[in-house]
Amino acid sequence: MKLTCVLIAAVLLLAVCQLDSADATGYMRKNPSLRSPKRTRGCKSKGSFCWNGIECCGGNCFFACVY
């Protein structure tokens, strides 16, 4: 029972993270100035702990920056 609850919580967390990063990607697509290489100054590198995909240079977050 505990394992089932943990798996459900993990899947829900992953879904929220994916929806959040998808929204950020759409926003960057609408505003071309955000896609410039200069924007990487304030972002976190691959392997850094994150809460949101916007924090990562690659835009993908799953507890740590993926790219």
Swiss-Prot record:
What's a single GO MF annotation on this record? toxin activity
Check the UniProt entry and state the signal peptide residues, or none. 1-24
Q: Which residues form a coiled coil?
A: none
The entry's propeptide annotation covers 25-37
Keyword terms of this UniProt record:
Disulfide bond, Knottin, Neurotoxin, Secreted, Signal, Toxin
InterPro entries per record: Conotoxin
Entry's Gene Ontology cellular component terms: extracellular region
Record's subcellular location: Secreted
Q: Which cysteines are joined by disulfide bonds?
A: 43-57, 50-61, 56-65
Q: In which tissues is it expressed?
A: Expressed by the venom duct.
Q: What's the family?
A: Belongs to the conotoxin O1 superfamily.
Record remark: domains: The presence of a 'disulfide through disulfide knot' structurally defines this protein as a knottin. The cysteine framework is VI/VII (C-C-CC-C-C).
**What is this protein's name?**
Conotoxin Cl6.6b
Q: In which organism is this protein found?
A: Californiconus californicus (California cone)
